[in-house]
Design a protein with these regions (language model features):
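Short amphipathic alpha-helical patches
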Residues: 45-53, 120, 124-131
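Conserved NTP-handling cores and scaffolds of large molecular machines
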Residues: 29, 107-110
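N-terminal functional modules and adjacent low-complexity/disordered segments of proteins
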Residues: 21, 108, 141-144
Length: 154
């Protein structure tokens, strides 16, 4: 393992779990349509280089854009890395391809459900060094956190 590489990168684990929720909701919507009052507000980074959208939308939304998936959407397709959908803007249907890594928020207001995928680049949880040293010392003295397994005798 490289020195800079984290053994447990919680930020990445949380982000990939949140993206999995978004994918699941969009997959179900793609397969069965949307019902029961559900609708989605999805905010994404329009500066993300892989996203595909008409130039006039990039100009109108230079940093972020929120789309609504409710009544007027077509051809919703969900891929491993992105989703694509046709939406109506200014009376015209346009195709958007949005990478999950650019999604900032996912909201289903029918359930007051909000996911914030815009996780900051800082450690989510960090113990102070002093507390960590005390805890390690207690664990070594106590050894209650160690489990020994004996191989089965033949």
């Amino acid at each position: 393992m490289k020195k800079k590489e984290m053994f447990l990168d919680y930020k990445s684990l949380v982000k990939s779990s949140l993206i999995a929720v978004v994918k699941h909701a969009l997959n179900k919507t793609s397969e069965y349509g949307i019902s029961d009052g559900h609708h989605f507000y999805i905010t994404f980074d329009t500066t993300y280089s892989k996203n595909e959208m008409p130039q006039y939308l990039k100009k109108d939304y230079p940093k972020t854009m929120m789309i609504v998936i409710e009544n007027e959407f077509w051809n919703l397709k969900v891929d491993q890395e992105f989703f694509s959908v046709d939406l109506k803007f200014k009376g015209k249907i346009d195709h958007l391809k949005i990478y999950f890594s650019s999604v900032k928020t996912f909201v289903d207001p029918s359930l007051s459900f909000t996911l914030n995928l815009d996780i900051e680049d800082k450690v989510i949880y960090k113990k102070s060094d002093a507390k960590t040293k005390i805890l390690k010392k207690k664990q070594i003295e106590n050894k209650s956190n160690i489990i020994f397994l004996k191989p089965k005798s033949s």
